[in-house]
């Protein structure tokens, strides 16, 4: 799949979704990067549209692939941006089973990936008491303490 550079990414999210699911690793990275950039805009990031695409579980999967730290970083950053939205947005990230992956990324050893995992877990735990408890139960506090004692 290829994008029409003349159109905004938000108008081409279906093409971006296909990039994430195709067999080409380079397309996975391009798709994750495009979603992350679309979600990084200050005014009205398209969180709902990205959630409706059904790509959050795929972003979780890609963020746990140690063969490409750059892809891990982009996918985790996209998840971080979704989790920074409304409670419903954050719940979608949680429902995609992202929390255990994010906690495991705290020991990834790649600074950028670790930093994004910390941000994402902070966004999730800061949303509500139940989400905070979920993050704590997943072992995030112990993993983060290891980061500062290393």
Please name every model-derived segment.
Residues 112-115, 120-134, 140-142:
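Alpha-helical scaffolds that organize eukaryotic protein assemblies
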């Amino acid at each position: 799949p290829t994008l029409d550079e003349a159109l905004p990414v938000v108008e081409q999210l279906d093409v971006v979704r296909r990039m994430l699911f195709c067999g080409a690793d380079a397309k996975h990275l391009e798709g994750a990067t495009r979603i992350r950039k679309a979600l990084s805009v200050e005014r009205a990031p398209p969180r709902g549209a990205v959630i409706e695409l059904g790509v959050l579980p795929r972003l979780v999967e890609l963020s746990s692939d140690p063969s490409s730290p750059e892809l891990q970083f982009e996918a985790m950053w996209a998840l971080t941006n979704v989790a920074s939205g409304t409670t419903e947005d954050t719940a979608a990230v949680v429902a995609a089973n992202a929390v255990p992956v994010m906690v495991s990324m705290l020991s990834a050893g790649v600074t950028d990936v670790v930093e994004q995992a910390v941000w994402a877990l902070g966004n999730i735990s800061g949303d509500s008491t139940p989400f905070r408890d979920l993050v704590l139960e997943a072992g995030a506090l112990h993993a983060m303490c290891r980061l500062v004692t290393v």
